[in-house]
């Protein structure tokens, strides 16, 4: 009969009383008690006992004693598996230090702890830091264990995957190309580790927009996943979804939708119609239909998906919010701008409640909402929303940040639509000063702003100033792009058009 945690706790208390906190029998009993707590899923209690026992162990032998290594390793692994990644990382870092002090910097215990620190950093979003550690561990394992040792290859794989997460896809692909033959030689082509590395190669090709190669790699990898993991395994569904995304990015819309439809059907059978994975594939399917320009069918799918997510999760769930956004974007694409604007407005209110007025997500949504209002011809309301978004963006990102600059530009353009030319001119002057600072005098952004500034001068009737701006702008466009470039011709065509008009030109924004 297996003793319960309650029984083991009583036994432990007796030993602590009789033999003392530092006795070996007490240590063993304490470990058994912790194991029972973990088995009974009493994780908070187990964490507290781990911490207490580790403190006693340090008191007995010293914090840097090798006698603390097994218990600290066990505690760190427990924290990691329990999802307490930050505290786990702290314990692994101390474990690495103690192991290096007692066993040496390239001892396997030290390298294992160091690698676990990197895993924790990865989970916490510090991918750059994790990549640096993975690189050091891989180098040490090559020196200590040899280049083809399984541990060395595993560390190499961790480093390769981490490179991809940092956005260094070219470097990640190069490592994949070198690593795959080693994996095949050591473990074989059908080993799950080899199969997973093929998936990483496909992802790197995908990220580098080498779509034909990526599609071929994905197709072969999917077959391997089905053989190795089975058609119903979550990892098989994941790689199939990545393949569908790659097809879509490669503009194979029909193939992408067909594959996503099959993926959705299989997910409903394997996981059920309301499983989060199924609902995500449903969202991808609805979006794919829109990419095929099947807007009405896409809207019907989004409508049903939104109703399902509202019923299951409520309006504040991230997946529900994501679907509302997708639905609104398709409405915009179908030229139902007023309907789209209503959904954007509702979405903004929901996100503000959860994240606050100046959260970056609110700024992004407010900008999208303003564009929808602009497309619907509601210029006054659009200018108000652009103004709110730009003020928040200035506070959050700063006056020279690209996101603030873009929103500010859209606000100025909307003022022109409202015939508020004097205000628009002031905004364009400020924008030009910032654009020259962050983009440069000869950048396309600066040239476009000078064009808008010139047109606004014409609209205000400041014809002499406008023609002066025009002459300099044509000279600069010719110098930067050449006489026959579309940008140069566009400016010249506007000048010719204005010169041929007697009356004041109409709204300068097309």
Question: What would you call each of these model-derived segments?
Answer:
Residues 1-510:
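Intrinsic-disorder-linked linear interaction elements in eukaryotic regulatory proteins
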């Amino acid at each position: 009969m297996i003793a319960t945690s309650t029984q083991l706790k009583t036994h432990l208390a007796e030993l602590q009383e009789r033999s003392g906190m530092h006795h070996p029998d007490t240590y063993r009993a304490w470990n058994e008690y912790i194991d029972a707590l973990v088995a009974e899923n009493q994780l908070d209690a187990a964490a507290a006992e781990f911490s207490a026992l580790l403190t006693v162990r340090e008191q007995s032998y010293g914090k840097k004693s090798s006698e603390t290594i097994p218990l600290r390793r066990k505690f760190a692994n427990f924290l990691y598996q329990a999802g307490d990644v930050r505290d786990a990382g702290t314990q692994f870092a101390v474990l690495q230090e103690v192991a290096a002090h007692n066993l040496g910097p390239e001892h396997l215990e030290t390298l294992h702890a160091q690698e676990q620190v990197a895993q924790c950093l990865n989970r916490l979003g510090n991918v750059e830091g994790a990549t640096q550690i993975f690189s050091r561990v891989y180098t040490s394992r090559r020196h200590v264990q040899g280049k083809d040792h399984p541990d060395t290859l595993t560390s190499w794989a961790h480093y390769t995957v981490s490179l991809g997460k940092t956005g260094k896809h070219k470097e990640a692909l190069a490592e994949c190309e070198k690593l795959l033959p080693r994996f095949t030689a050591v473990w074989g082509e059908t080993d799950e580790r080899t199969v997973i590395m093929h998936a990483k190669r496909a992802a790197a090709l995908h990220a580098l927009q080498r779509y034909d190669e990526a599609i071929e790699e994905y197709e072969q990898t999917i077959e391997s996943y089905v053989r190795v993991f089975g058609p119903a395994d979550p990892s098989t569904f994941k790689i199939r979804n990545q393949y569908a995304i790659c097809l879509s990015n490669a503009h194979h819309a029909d193939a992408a939708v067909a594959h996503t439809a099959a993926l959705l059907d299989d997910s409903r059978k394997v996981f059920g119609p309301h499983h989060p994975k199924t609902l995500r594939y449903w969202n991808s399917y609805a979006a794919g239909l829109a990419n095929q320009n099947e807007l009405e069918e896409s809207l019907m799918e989004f409508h049903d998906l939104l109703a399902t997510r509202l019923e299951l999760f409520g309006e504040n769930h991230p997946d529900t919010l994501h679907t509302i956004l997708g639905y609104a974007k398709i409405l915009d694409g179908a030229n139902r701008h007023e309907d789209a604007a209503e959904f954007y407005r509702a979405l903004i209110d929901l996100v503000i409640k959860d994240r606050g007025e100046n959260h970056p997500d609110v700024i992004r949504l407010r900008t999208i909402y303003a564009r929808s209002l602009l497309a619907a011809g509601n210029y006054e309301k659009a200018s108000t929303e652009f103004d709110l978004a730009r003020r928040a963006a200035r506070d959050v990102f700063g006056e020279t940040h690209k996101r603030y600059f873009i929103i500010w530009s859209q606000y100025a353009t909307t003022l022109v639509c409202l015939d508020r030319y004097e205000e628009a001119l002031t905004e364009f002057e400020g924008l030009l000063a910032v654009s020259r600072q962050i983009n440069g005098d000869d950048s396309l952004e600066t040239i476009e702003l000078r064009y808008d500034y010139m047109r606004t001068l014409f609209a205000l009737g400041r014809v002499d100033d406008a023609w002066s701006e025009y002459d300099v702008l044509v000279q600069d466009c010719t110098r930067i792009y050449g006489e026959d470039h579309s940008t140069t011709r566009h400016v010249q065509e506007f000048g010719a058009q204005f010169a041929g008009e007697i009356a004041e030109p109409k709204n300068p924004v097309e």
